[in-house]
C-alpha cells in the first residue's frame, strides 16, 4: 500500500469513528482499538514530529525509522496484547510566558510518541463531535489566532463588559487521575485504549537521576496530554458553563478557551462576580486550584460606555498578547492586541543570548538562523494591530546582532557599517500575517 493509499485508509476510518460518535451521543464506545493497525501506526508516525527532544532511551526518529516496518509491527503487537510498557518520561524545565517561572515538561521516547499519536487520533475523533466551538487549543483546524479573533469579535458585539481572567495553578500537574478516568469511561469503553492511557498516566518521571511516580497530572510534552487536558476541561468547565452557568445569567456571556488558558466576558458586573465566586468551588471538586494573584475581574467596557463610577476599561493578557480598547483607522472602537511586555522581553532576551553565543559562527549561518527566528516571530505575532511591536523587535534584533559582531571583532561597529552588512544579508522586515479587526 502506497503512502497516499495508507493515508486515505486512515481518513476513511476517521470518518467512521466520527459517524459512530455522532450516532451514539453519550454512549461509551466499546470497539475502537480495532481501527489501529500497521497503516494507522504508519500514519501516526508520519504525523509525529521528527525533530523533537529525545526520551530516556536516547533514540532519535531517524534511528527508529531505520527499521520502521519491523518497529511498527512490534509496537502494534505489544499495544494490542497488553505487553506494551510505557517508559518513563524525561522531565525538563522551560521558561513560562512571563519568563520568571519555569514550566515542567515530560519528554516521551519517540516510539511512545507514535503510539500516543495513534491513540489520540482515535479518541480525538470521538471528542471532536462534542467539544464546543469556543475551545481552540490543540484541535484540528483551530488556532490561537482564531481564539484572538473570537475575543475581538465578542468584545465588539457586546460593546465590552466585565471580563474574568483565569489562571489555573499548575493545571497539567494537578489533573486528578480518578476524575479523568471517570470522564473518559463515559465515552470510551474500549479496554485496549483505556489500558494504554492508564499506563501513560502512571508512567514514571525521570528528573536528573531520580525516578518518581506522580499520582496526579498529565505531563506537558506528551502527544496525548493536550487532548486529555481538553477532555478534562470540556467536562469540568465547558459543559458546566453551557449547561449550568449560562442559563442562570441575567445577560450574555462568552467564553474563549485555549487549552488551560481562558477568559469569560460578561455583559454585567453582577454575572461576572457570581461566576468568579462559584468557579473555585467547581474546580476544587476536581482537584484544580485558581492562582489567586492571576485570577481577577477586569472592567472591560468600551470606553464610550464607561460610567462615572466605573473603573474601566482595563487590559488583560492572553496567548502572549495584551488586549485593550482603542480607536481603529476608520474611527470605530475595537479591541487591539499587542505583544505582551513579558513575551516581548523574553523573546528579545533569547535572541540576544543566541547572538552572543553564536557570534563566532560564519556570517551566512548566523544570518540564516536569524532570518528563521524573525520569520517565526512574525508568523505568530504578526497581527493587524501589532505592527509597532514587530518593528520594535526588528530594530532590537538588528542592534543585538550588531553588538554581538562588534564583540566578535573587538571593534566598534558604526551603523553605516552594519547597513552594508544588512545589504549583503537582508533580515526580513516586519509583516502582518494575520489580518482582522481593522
What are these model-derived regions, one by one?
Residues 1-438:
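Non-catalytic terminal/accessory segments
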Amino acid at each position: 500500500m502506497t503512502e497516499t493509499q495508507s493515508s486515505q485508509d486512515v481518513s476513511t476510518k476517521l470518518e467512521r469513528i466520527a459517524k459512530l460518535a455522532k450516532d451514539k451521543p453519550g454512549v461509551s464506545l466499546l470497539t475502537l482499538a480495532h481501527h489501529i493497525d500497521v497503516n494507522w501506526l504508519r500514519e501516526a508516525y508520519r504525523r509525529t514530529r521528527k525533530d523533537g527532544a529525545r526520551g530516556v532511551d536516547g533514540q532519535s526518529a531517524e534511528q527508529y525509522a531505520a527499521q520502521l516496518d519491523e518497529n511498527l509491527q512490534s509496537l502494534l503487537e505489544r499495544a494490542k496484547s497488553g505487553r506494551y510498557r510505557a517508559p518513563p518520561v524525561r522531565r525538563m524545565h522551560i521558561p513560562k510566558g512571563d519568563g520568571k517561572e519555569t514550566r515542567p515538561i515530560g519528554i516521551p521516547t519517540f516510539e511512545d510518541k507514535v503510539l500516543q499519536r495513534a491513540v489520540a487520533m482515535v479518541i480525538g475523533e470521538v471528542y471532536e463531535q462534542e467539544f464546543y466551538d469556543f475551545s481552540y487549543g490543540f484541535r484540528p483546524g483551530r488556532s490561537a489566532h482564531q481564539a484572538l479573533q473570537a475575543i475581538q469579535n465578542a468584545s465588539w458585539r457586546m460593546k465590552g463588559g466585565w471580563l474574568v481572567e483565569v489562571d489555573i495553578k499548575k493545571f497539567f500537574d494537578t489533573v486528578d487521575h480518578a476524575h479523568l478516568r471517570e470522564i473518559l469511561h463515559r465515552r470510551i469503553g474500549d479496554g485496549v485504549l483505556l489500558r494504554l492511557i492508564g499506563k501513560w498516566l502512571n508512567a514514571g518521571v525521570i528528573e536528573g537521576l531520580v525516578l518518581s511516580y506522580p499520582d496526579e497530572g498529565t505531563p506537558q510534552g506528551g502527544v496525548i496530554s493536550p487532548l486529555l487536558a481538553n477532555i478534562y476541561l470540556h467536562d469540568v468547565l465547558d459543559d458546566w458553563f453551557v449547561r449550568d452557568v449560562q442559563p442562570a445569567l441575567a445577560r450574555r456571556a462568552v467564553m474563549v478557551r485555549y487549552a488551560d488558558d481562558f477568559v469569560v466576558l460578561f455583559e454585567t458586573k453582577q454575572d461576572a462576580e457570581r461566576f468568579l465566586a462559584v468557579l473555585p468551588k467547581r474546580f476544587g471538586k476536581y482537584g484544580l486550584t485558581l492562582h489567586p494573584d492571576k485570577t481577577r475581574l477586569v472592567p472591560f467596557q468600551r470606553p464610550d460606555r464607561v460610567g462615572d463610577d466605573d473603573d474601566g476599561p482595563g487590559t488583560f493578557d492572553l496567548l502572549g498578547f495584551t488586549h485593550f480598547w482603542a480607536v481603529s483607522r476608520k474611527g470605530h472602537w475595537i479591541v487591539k492586541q499587542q505583544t505582551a511586555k513579558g513575551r516581548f522581553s523574553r523573546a528579545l532576551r533569547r535572541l540576544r543570548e543566541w547572538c552572543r553565543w553564536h557570534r563566532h559562527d560564519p556570517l551566512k549561518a548566523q544570518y540564516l538562523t536569524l532570518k528563521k527566528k524573525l520569520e517565526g516571530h512574525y508568523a505568530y505575532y504578526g497581527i493587524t494591530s501589532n505592527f509597532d511591536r514587530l518593528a520594535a523587535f526588528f530594530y532590537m534584533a538588528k542592534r543585538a546582532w550588531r553588538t554581538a559582531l562588534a564583540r566578535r571583532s573587538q571593534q566598534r561597529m558604526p551603523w553605516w557599517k552594519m547597513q552594508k552588512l544588512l545589504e549583503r544579508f537582508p533580515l526580513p522586515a516586519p509583516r502582518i500575517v494575520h489580518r482582522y479587526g481593522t
